[in-house]
């Protein structure tokens, strides 16, 4: 894939990533996203690292990871749509809508494949939903999952997700295997619960895998080139290198009066992300070292 040019790094190899690095990792099942990040930090000997888009502990799959200053790039990456593959267990009653907090299993008669497809088709588009109470969202400064574990009342706001595609892969009762293409921040556990609810039964996910975020997929531990995957056009600012280097105030006219929007200014040793707004040049990220 074009976006994944760069040096190849095996997770188990002895090579080290650069101090500033951006790459796609693959989190195993039954490990928190933070635990996985700490493991990568130890393996590659880095102190500063971060990830974008938490995966549930029971889920596996793509996790975008950055080391060093490149953690500042997360807000500028195009991570939509997110594509997931999941298995929904019909009749499984779980507080967390997965296999981690099972309350019981109900044996239910099978549905027709056509009925399942009809329900899934009706969920495509923009839908409102309530996140699972076992989630990382904060309520009054506390994590919802901590409150749920303490048997406290958890009241989460209604959210909106955009479901671009919801496809039935196969249905072997009581397991519904599906693939979903959704907007950033969506909860696939909630989507699975909605499918089951509309069928008239309990349901929870027995497996969940994130396949991609935008154009980013796991293809081995390869370093991504930021200038190839950032979604902004480049602007010629070669003659203003010193001004960019020191973050000096600039006007849009200094850059030829481009239309309002976000741009990348590339120089030999570094690049900057700027925004042209109301005739001004706003530095969003300045002096990001190139690797």
Swiss-Prot record:
It holds the Pfam family TruB_N. It is an enzyme of class 5 (isomerase). Keywords: Isomerase, tRNA processing. InterPro entries: PsdUridine_synth_cat_dom_sf, PsdUridine_synth_N, tRNA_psdUridine_synth_TruB. It catalyses: uridine(55) in tRNA = pseudouridine(55) in tRNA. One of its GO terms (biological process) is tRNA pseudouridine synthesis. Its EC number is 5.4.99.25. This is tRNA pseudouridine synthase B.
């Amino acid at each position: 894939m074009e976006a994944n040019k760069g040096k190849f790094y095996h997770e188990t190899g002895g090579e080290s990533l650069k101090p500033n690095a951006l790459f796609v990792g693959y989190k195993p099942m039954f490990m928190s996203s933070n635990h996985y990040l700490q493991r990568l930090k130890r393996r590659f000997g880095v102190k500063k690292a971060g990830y974008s888009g938490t995966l549930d502990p029971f889920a596996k799959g793509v996790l975008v990871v950055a080391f060093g200053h490149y953690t500042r790039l997360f807000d500028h990456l195009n991570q939509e749509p997110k594509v997931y593959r999941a298995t929904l267990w019909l009749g499984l009653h779980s507080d967390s809508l997965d296999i981690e907090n099972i309350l019981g299993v109900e044996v239910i008669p099978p549905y027709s494949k056509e009925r399942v497809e009809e329900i899934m088709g009706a969920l495509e588009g923009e839908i409102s939903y309530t996140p699972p109470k076992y989630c990382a969202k904060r309520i009054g400064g506390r994590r919802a999952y901590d409150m749920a574990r303490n048997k406290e009342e958890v009241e989460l706001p209604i959210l909106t997700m955009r479901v671009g595609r919801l496809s039935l892969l196969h249905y072997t009762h009581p397991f519904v295997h599906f693939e979903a293409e959704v907007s950033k921040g969506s909860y696939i556990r909630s989507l699975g619960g909605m499918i089951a609810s509309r069928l008239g039964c309990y349901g929870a996910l027995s497996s969940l895998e994130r396949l991609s975020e935008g154009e980013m997929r796991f293809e081995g531990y390869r370093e991504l080139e930021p200038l190839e995957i950032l979604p902004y056009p480049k602007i010629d600012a070669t003659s203003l290198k010193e001004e960019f280097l020191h973050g000096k105030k600039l006007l849009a006219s200094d850059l030829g009066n481009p239309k309002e929007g976000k741009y990348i200014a590339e120089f030999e040793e570094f690049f900057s992300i700027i925004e042209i707004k109301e005739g001004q040049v706003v530095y969003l990220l300045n002096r990001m070292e190139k690797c």
